[in-house]
Amino acid sequence: MSNKDSIIHVIETRKSVRSFTDETPSADILCRCGAESSPYLKVVDAAAIGNGRVGTYGVISGRPAYVAVVCKDDEQVQAGIDGERMVLALTELGIGTCWLGGTFSRQRVTEAVAVPDGARCVAVIAAGYARQHRGLVERVMRTSVRADHRMCVSDFIIAGVAPRELDSALEAVRLAPSACNRQPWRFAFNLSGSIDVYGTPSDSFMKLDVGIALAHFLAVQPHYRMTENTHYIPKLTAITTLIPD
């Protein structure tokens, strides 16, 4: 397979995992996948939080490792990109992951990692080895968020016509995880070849979710760079403009 085909396969393979075995991936594996190369990702020391758990209220079973996503509000898009790049690298190694935005103890995590002034822990990523069969809680969670039901690519294109050569990248965006499966990203295609990216005002995780989706797009189409989106559309939040090199 070509590198692009490999990346697409990893994106198609990735599923949110909530039922893990008791085998915990090492911090070295997490770091090799990008957990410490980003200023927004911090491996949670299991010893510092006691019993290796971050208070996930029964949503997560088993003993995965945890990576805290720590950033300021205006850094959430890049934090989402960096976090999902790590997720894809872990997926390629056969390690399951799950983004957690609300179902964990922020206090417990904040006490275990360094949080810069003005920043906060916006999410954690659980990473571990998936159990062969999903537990009851996981099955209920997947049903409640309609995890296997996603919008069509055409549903998040709000203007212009997407070039056919971007079909794979846009399908990768469609497969990106998001809080409650809301998929808050919207794309507008310009005649110049640039793409204006917006977010719907859904919840406090919107910018993080758009960053996660952008990680998928840029993984498949790395020859785009991000710049400021100066185009206003009512009821949408301008996130970035993607410009082809």
How would you label these PLM feature ranges?
Residues 1-245:
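Acidic, surface-exposed loops and disordered segments
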